Amino acid sequence: MAKKYVYYFGDGKAEGASNMKELLGGKGAGLAEMTNLGISVPPGFTISTEACVEYYKNGKHYPPGMWDAALKSLKRVEQSMGMGFGDPERPLLVSVRSGARASMPGMMDTVLNVGLTTKTVEGLAAKTRNDRFAQDSYRRFVSMYGSIVMGVPREHFEAILKQKKAEVGVPHETHLDARHLRELVSNFKALVKEETKKEFPDEPLEQLRLAVNAVFSSWFGARAVTYRRLYGIPDSWGTAINVVAMVFGNMGETSGTGVAFTRDPASGDKNFFGECLMNAQGEDVVAGIRTPLPVNALAKNVPEAYKELEHTYKKLEKHYRDMLDLEFTIQEGKLYMLQTRVGKRTGIAAVKIAVDMVREGLISKQEAVQRIGPEQLAQYLYPIFDTKEESKSNPLGKGLPAGPGAAAGKIALTPDRAVTMKAAGTRVVLVRQETSPDDIHGMNAAAGFLTARGGMTSHAAVVARQVNRALTVQVALTDLV
């Protein structure tokens, strides 16, 4: 019997479960478990970590039967959604996301909107009666695929986008209309051709295959390797890949995306805590490029979806008996859950959450003690500002506290500079407009860091809480000049 490498989930049933994290990765196991619990999850399938290990053993070739099994599962997704992958009238689009067994926030790659072509983008526009949405999805896809799969520097796409906003005279891309976005797609494709000497792929299955290759390859990307070295994660584990039917947070003002924690990851308070963006896609929140809204803003914008989100997070926390990190998308008022995992937290939050969960009868005292590591207890000894002196001070800037403690040091404006300064014996504070997962080496070298953009749920904030670094986000950097 052929080895099983692909596990389907959808329509309330999944071939996996939460206890299969080693095989399905954390994300895949979470998607399977939420599906089995009857929570609203888009259909999809997980390619196992074993497939990734075999991919590298075989000289970057898929193990026997993997691709055929993936295509069979894709057919099941098509049937569930009533759409076709590559169908010019009812196009199914998918996301291709990494998911290792150990959480590695932002360290590997994700590609959204796979399946968009010159034909399917017109079908998407006609089906949704929303040309702007279709063109916005296409320009996002070309830039993401172009950078992750085809190796064009992300900054080159951002420069073209910045130039277009300046031409039109708008502050943000949400103000660009369908015509402007079509022009961006053309400009992005021209950039890809110029940089790679290749045409942007216009065949959906080719897009999918190359996206899967790119996500497998990101397991040995520089930032993923650095992260694994820091946290003792073996190279031999490999990553799973989740191919999931796209749901869209960028379809208008009743659509959005967000990241939330079932309790405050900084303080441990029993408050539903998170951030969201309306008319946006998931990477917009965690990338820290745009400053998000608090998650409870959804109660006003999409009240029914917010009620369902509240019900869902309570159900999941009770089921997992831990504080959870959630990702979700709302498409025209309907909630879809995209991820659940045990949330990273500060040491102070870890102690409070453990004590509170004992009082609530969710865990035993023994479990509470086992959940607190020495590094988390050490945070109680971290330096903080003297409150009396702080009250007398005249701060140059203010922001939100996303990481533990306080820090002092000389400013470094790039991650590489932070590494160099630390090697010379200097304490460093890394200052950036926003951080990305590519900055992990500089974040580890710094005593603390601050950013102008991003929120409390961005990848930077998640990593800061894990590496025990002080982080302040949403600081007006002009105040520091």
Model-derived features: where do they sit?
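Generic beta-sheet signal
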Residues: 452, 474-476
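Beta-strand/loop nucleic-acid-binding surfaces
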Residues: 472-474, 481
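Nucleotide/phosphate-binding sheet-loop regions of phosphoryl- and nucleotidyl-transfer enzymes
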Residues: 1-393, 420, 426-429, 436-441, ...
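Extended, non-globular alpha-helical segments
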Residues: 398-438
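Residues forming the flavin
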Residues: 469
